[in-house]
Amino acid sequence: MQFENVELDEGCLLGQEGQGLKLALATLGRVRLAQVAARAVGKASMILDDCLDYARNRRQFGSAIGEFQLIQQMLADSAMEINACRLALWQTASRIDAGDEARGAISMLKVQASEMLGRVVDRAVQIYGGAGYCRDLPIERYYRDARIARIYDGTSEIHRMVMARQMMKGDVGLFDIYEQAR
């Protein structure tokens, strides 16, 4: 997009002149935090709640399927992953609130949360069995919707490159939470 012979009052300028791309990229990070990571945590939590209800009520061989060890393991694994992403989300938001650009941390969280959502919904399909794959239940749609989270706002592979570049520049805070506290 190009503008020629456009005049604006200084009061209409967002940020500093010549710094528009930097401002846009900084804003993108916050958008990724809210649009991808927070949504992934919220959707995964909702899916886990649905799975818990289903596991309590669906009976197989005379018992609720939630009493079966493999179902319990899937529920527990989903809860652990959701909790880890939620804590990482809060930590990253706190860094941004403190004025840190947190570019690498945002990329890490985008990958972590979007891939976590994929694993949680994959387990949900397993818990629901064949019914989870049918269009009669929302799990099938959640499964399709979860896949796009790894693509939009930058693919997981691109965000891994961003993380690695930040680490190569010396941002050990990506993997050393004690370094972040200093």
Task: Indicate residue ranges for each PLM-predicted region.
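Glycine-rich beta->alpha junctions and the first turn(s) of the following alpha-helix
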Residues: 1-84, 149, 161, 165, ...
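Active-site beta-strand/loop segments that form the cofactor-binding cradle
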Residues: 6-13, 125-128, 132-133
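Glycine-rich phosphate/cofactor-binding loops in nucleotide/flavin-utilizing enzymes
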Residues: 26, 30, 128-182
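Generic, well-ordered alpha-helical scaffold segments in large soluble proteins
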Residues: 27, 47-54, 91, 95, ...
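Short, conserved micro-motifs enriched in small and acidic residues
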Residues: 31-38, 103, 107, 111, ...
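C-terminal helix-coil-helix/basic helical segment that borders enzyme active sites and/or dimer interfaces
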Residues: 52, 56-63, 79-112, 125-130
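Charge-rich, acidic-biased intrinsically disordered regions
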Residues: 67-71, 103-111, 132-148
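Amphipathic alpha-helical coiled-coil segments
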Residues: 116-124
